Amino acid sequence: MGVHILSTGSSVPNFSVENQQFEDMIETSDHWISTRTGIKKRHLAPSSTSLTKLAAEAANKALYAANLKPTEISLIILATSTPDDLFGSASQLQAEIGATTPVAFDITAACSGFIVALVTAAQFIQLVYDNILVVGADTCLDGLIGQIELPVFYLVMVLEQLVLGQSLKNSILGFKLCTDGQLNSHLQLMNKPVNNQKFGGTEIPHGNYNSITMNGKEVYKFAVFQVPTVIRQCLNNLNISIDEVDWFILHQANTRIIEAIASRLSVPFSKMITNLEHYGNTSAASIPLALDEAIQSNKIQPGQIIVLSGFGAGLTWGAIVLKW
């Protein structure tokens, strides 16, 4: 039985912030941000908007496009690093959309989260699950503006949904996932013990989180080496040449990274689908959001070969080859 992508849907907060608005908050400029990252604006959610509610909006769009009812979904997988509930928000999403039957769980793999979630869903489809809702969602990290060591202009909130179903047609031709924990320190958001309580002579910490830390040079070197490598490995395993790929959709971290990867693959940048200019780095939502926009604009056509590739904290990376 094949794995077929039935539909996509997305939801973005209406409120957007352009680069100039950061100039009074931190020492930066529109020119510095746009020339180094490709980002011109990003979308932020007000405190009254939850990740779960935005995810539900996107889910309903995807379900409508697939002509499915929420009760016809058998599994929900939410890829996020910023859940409303640290114990998991997939169950909240299940309740929000009225999907009474599916099991629901979260996956945390940072900017590679959607790739990991999609591969995970594909394995369940091969078993007994009929229709699976795959979600990539991340929010602005509340309270970190002015403290965060990763530049604040990366922070955004975008939700994206994708519905998989069983079919004789197979959308996912191949994949490869990788992790190198030796490089973990290059991109972290670590637990920080605070407010220790003493029980006898032993201190018991109450945890909190530090700011995000990133070694930008090392993450850049990692991405521009490992992403082309894993893409070539996937394509070679399928006997598909680079020239046969119609579109590449990479994690939307930074325009310079995407340009370098295109160069190393010897493909024109015009084959790289990007939306960084309008959304910034949307973490686990970046790949599916770019995919959804390309579908809605009819850029992606039936029968085309598409490569998805994510990379991020862990350090993790991976690629999926699709036939639309």
UniProtKB/Swiss-Prot annotation:
<protein>
    <recommendedName>
        <fullName>Beta-ketoacyl-[acyl-carrier-protein] synthase III</fullName>
        <ecNumber>2.3.1.180</ecNumber>
    </recommendedName>
</protein>
<keyword id="KW-0275">Fatty acid biosynthesis</keyword>
<dbReference type="InterPro" id="IPR013751">
    <property type="entry name" value="ACP_syn_III_N"/>
</dbReference>
<keyword id="KW-0443">Lipid metabolism</keyword>
<dbReference type="InterPro" id="IPR016039">
    <property type="entry name" value="Thiolase-like"/>
</dbReference>
<feature type="region of interest" description="ACP-binding">
    <location>
        <begin position="252"/>
        <end position="256"/>
    </location>
</feature>
<comment type="similarity">
    <text>Belongs to the thiolase-like superfamily. FabH family.</text>
</comment>
<dbReference type="Pfam" id="PF08545">
    <property type="entry name" value="ACP_syn_III"/>
</dbReference>
<keyword id="KW-0276">Fatty acid metabolism</keyword>
<keyword id="KW-0012">Acyltransferase</keyword>
<comment type="subunit">
    <text>Homodimer.</text>
</comment>
<dbReference type="Pfam" id="PF08541">
    <property type="entry name" value="ACP_syn_III_C"/>
</dbReference>
<feature type="active site">
    <location>
        <position position="251"/>
    </location>
</feature>
<dbReference type="InterPro" id="IPR013747">
    <property type="entry name" value="ACP_syn_III_C"/>
</dbReference>
<keyword id="KW-0934">Plastid</keyword>
<keyword id="KW-0150">Chloroplast</keyword>
<comment type="pathway">
    <text>Lipid metabolism; fatty acid biosynthesis.</text>
</comment>
<dbReference type="GO" id="GO:0009507">
    <property type="term" value="C:chloroplast"/>
</dbReference>
<feature type="active site">
    <location>
        <position position="281"/>
    </location>
</feature>
<dbReference type="GO" id="GO:0004315">
    <property type="term" value="F:3-oxoacyl-[acyl-carrier-protein] synthase activity"/>
</dbReference>
<dbReference type="GO" id="GO:0006633">
    <property type="term" value="P:fatty acid biosynthetic process"/>
</dbReference>
<comment type="function">
    <text>Catalyzes the condensation reaction of fatty acid synthesis by the addition to an acyl acceptor of two carbons from malonyl-ACP. Catalyzes the first condensation reaction which initiates fatty acid synthesis and may therefore play a role in governing the total rate of fatty acid production. Possesses both acetoacetyl-ACP synthase and acetyl transacylase activities. Its substrate specificity determines the biosynthesis of branched-chain and/or straight-chain of fatty acids.</text>
</comment>
<dbReference type="GO" id="GO:0033818">
    <property type="term" value="F:beta-ketoacyl-acyl-carrier-protein synthase III activity"/>
</dbReference>
<keyword id="KW-0511">Multifunctional enzyme</keyword>
<dbReference type="InterPro" id="IPR004655">
    <property type="entry name" value="FabH"/>
</dbReference>
<feature type="active site">
    <location>
        <position position="111"/>
    </location>
</feature>
<keyword id="KW-0808">Transferase</keyword>
<keyword id="KW-0444">Lipid biosynthesis</keyword>
